[in-house]
Amino acid sequence: MHTTHIILVNLEYAELNQESEIIHYAENATDVFQHDAFDWRTVQDVIIGSNKPDELLNLLEQCLDTQQQQITQYLKVLNNNLGDSLYQIVSTLSNDNTFTLEFNELAKLLAGEYTFESGFFDIEYCTSRIDKDILQAVKEAPENYALVLFDYHN
């Protein structure tokens, strides 16, 4: 199985200028996730905010939308099958682990744990969770950011 992962690099924070430096930095920062997020990977593209600010913002907004859709989907499954309170959900899961996977995946998304399913990683904040604050910072100064797109295989 393979999927595209988008790695956000703050160029000011890392003091990077060349595309090759950006790729190397993104690889080094995510190497620790080998076997959790990927078995092997290849670079697909590098999008530098000063060159393509609209594309950079568009990809980040797509990541945010995807994450929100995933969270909503897991919540619907849990709500429809286990109830609408955390107490009900945990009580039911204690006796019947049928929906433990969905609960676990939801928790990983909310906690920003980087996995194969995440699709996104922010190196500066060491999180797979993209939120409106990160998006706003990139909107205000896209020239300070780059995205490295990897084809992850698992």
PLM regions and their residue ranges:
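Low-complexity, serine/threonine/proline-enriched polar segments
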Residues: 24-120
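Short, extreme N-terminal segment that most often corresponds to the first beta-strand
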Residues: 1-39, 144-154
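Acidic, proline/glycine-rich low-complexity IDRs
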Residues: 1, 111-154
